[in-house]
Amino acid sequence: MFRFDKEQMVIDFAGAKFGGQPGEYPTALSGTIFYARHKIVEDAKKGIFDKKAAEALINKQAEMQDITGNSALVQVFGGTEEALVNYIDFVSEVWEGPMLLDSTSGKARMAAAKRATEAGYAKQCIYNSINVSIDEEEFQSLAESDVEASIVLCFDPMDPSVEGKLNVLNNGGKTKDVGMLDLAEKAGIKYPLIDVAVTPMGAGAGNAVRASFAVKAKLGLAVGSGIHNVPSAWDWLREFRKGLREEGKEQIAKDVHHVCDIGANIVQTMASGDFVLYGPIDNAELAFPAVAMTDMIIAETAKELGTTPAAVHPLNKLI
């Protein structure tokens, strides 16, 4: 593999440790819980869910962390203020590691950061996210909270190029008059996690992968993405699976999506990724072995370059 000349930031947060040079620390893996239509959710607006099933999923991911050495993160999604607050209160009771505060609603994200601060578990939380769409109200809410970690999205809708992604981090690019990294610093963020914002294939997916190298080479920050979304937005794959189902090949239709879904995480890992948002937490037993194997290959090749894998690295645990 390779080593970056730039000194690389290591994220040491809420018991998780990732980042650094390729092959140094294993990739952190974040599974999403309470996502849209998640079968364990009984009322998505109020945040009512099967607590036993939720705890089992979180524990299974934690077990995979113990087995492979890859740090586990829990991405908590809630569509409303009430739901997200209920969810994160529960997760904080059963999980001591990092959790992402995630919602399509800015109000819900703000409520979650406020609740985490008041309840004393903000040091576990990763805000998702600081991006060009953040408004003054949400920024001030984040700044007033005790949250110290955040996903920072390097996406400029006016310039999806690699240069555009770097510019939006440094100076706001063509969309904002301030860089996302400056915003993060002003909000009190000590642990910025750079999401390279993978778009569908044919619309810039390759730029995001290349941006992973660029961000680490130029800024030395931890990078990653939710690259598993690429197969879901792939029209050809959707039609191919439809054809398989019409031929009565239901299981293969399911399997081919799983292969592409989990395989996408390998792409991000090979592209010097430090963390991967791998999708449904239900897939922990698929995602962790695949990424751990990739990490092992990277670490083995990086040894000749002077990179020593951490004691908890899969290369030291799974052979």
From Swiss-Prot:
Q: Which domain of life is it from?
A: Archaea
Pfam families on file: MtrH
Query: Is Electron transport one of the keywords?
Result: no
One annotated GO biological process: methylation
Its annotated pathway reads: One-carbon metabolism; methanogenesis from CO(2); methyl-coenzyme M from 5,10-methylene-5,6,7,8-tetrahydromethanopterin: step 2/2
GO molecular function terms listed in the Swiss-Prot or TrEMBL record = tetrahydromethanopterin S-methyltransferase activity
Q: What is its EC number?
A: 7.2.1.4
* Catalysed reaction, written as an equation: 5-methyl-5,6,7,8-tetrahydromethanopterin + coenzyme M + 2 Na(+)(in) = 5,6,7,8-tetrahydromethanopterin + methyl-coenzyme M + 2 Na(+)(out)
InterPro entries named among the record's database cross-references: Dihydropteroate_synth-like_sf, MeTrfase_MtrH/MtxH, MtrH
Family in the record: Belongs to the MtrH family.
Protein name stated in the entry: Tetrahydromethanopterin S-methyltransferase subunit H
Query: Which species is listed as the source?
Result: Methanococcus vannielii (strain ATCC 35089 / DSM 1224 / JCM 13029 / OCM 148 / SB)
Q: Gene of origin?
A: mtrH
